[in-house]
Swiss-Prot record:
Organism: Rattus norvegicus (Rat)
Protein location: Membrane
Self-association and partners: Homotetramer.
UniProt-listed SUPFAM superfamilies: NAD(P)-binding Rossmann-fold domains (SSF51735)
GO molecular function, one term: carbonyl reductase (NADPH) activity
Organism placement in taxonomy: Eukaryota, Metazoa, Chordata, Craniata, Vertebrata
Name of the protein this chain belongs to: L-xylulose reductase
Domain of life assignment: Eukaryota
Record PTM Phosphoserine, positions in chain: S46
Modified residues (Omega-N-methylarginine): R21
Modified residues (N-acetylmethionine): M1
Similarity comment: Belongs to the short-chain dehydrogenases/reductases (SDR) family.
Amino acid sequence: MDLGLAGRRALVTGAGKGIGRSTVLALQAAGAQVVAVSRTREDLDSLVRECPGVEPVCVDLADWEATEQALSNVGPVDLLVNNAAVATLQPFLEVTKEACDTSFNVNFRAVVQVSQIVARGMIARGVPGAIVNVSSQASQRALTNHTVYCSTKGALDMLTKVMALELGPHKIRVNAVNPTVVMTPMGRANWSDPHKAKVMLDRIPLGKFAEVENVVDTILFLLSNRSSMTTGSALPVDGGFLAT
C-alpha cells in the first residue's frame, strides 16, 4: 500500500534506538527525507552509516535553549514523530525531584517545544501536516513503580487532544500511538524474567508483546493521508490490554 510519504520531510526524535530508529528507516524506505534527532552522537553516526541521506541532529531535548538553537533552523517539516522518552522506575513513596524534572522535561515539555517549532513552520508555509506522539498503555493504566512515567504519558495523551483541537483549523493532524511492552533490545532485556513477563502477558488478550514493526506501521499510517480524517486519537497497539 502506497502511503504517499515520498518527497515529504519528516523529523523523528529519539531516533538513535528502538522505535525511533526503526521509524527513521521505514520513513526513508517510503521515500521521505528524514531529520533524525538524538542526544547520543554514536547512535546518530551509526544510523547515518546504515541509512545514508538521513540528516542527524544531536541535542538533549531536556535542554530547552539547546533544543531551540538546534531545531529553529531545521527547515521545512511536513511530518513529526515525537518519540524521545525516558523512564525512571521508582515506588511512589521514593519518587525524587530529579526523576520528575527529567521525565517531564523529556516526555512532555520537549513534545510541546518541538511541536511548536514544527507547527509554526507548517502554518507559516500554509501546508497541512501530521504529528504523532509516541505514548504508552501506561497513560491509561496504573503500573507499579511507574508513578512518573504513567503521569507523563497521561499528560501526553491530553496534550495530543489539545494540539489536535488547536492545530486542526490549520490542517495539522495530531494523534498518539499507545503501545504495550515493545520488543526492542531494551524491552527484551527488561522483560526477560518469565514470571515478570507472565504477569503482563496474562493481561493481554493476544498473549504477546508488540514487535517494533507493529508500532512503526501504526505511526506511518497516522502520518499518511490514509488516516486523513483521524486526529486527536490515542491508538492502542497493545494486543487488547486496554480492553481488559
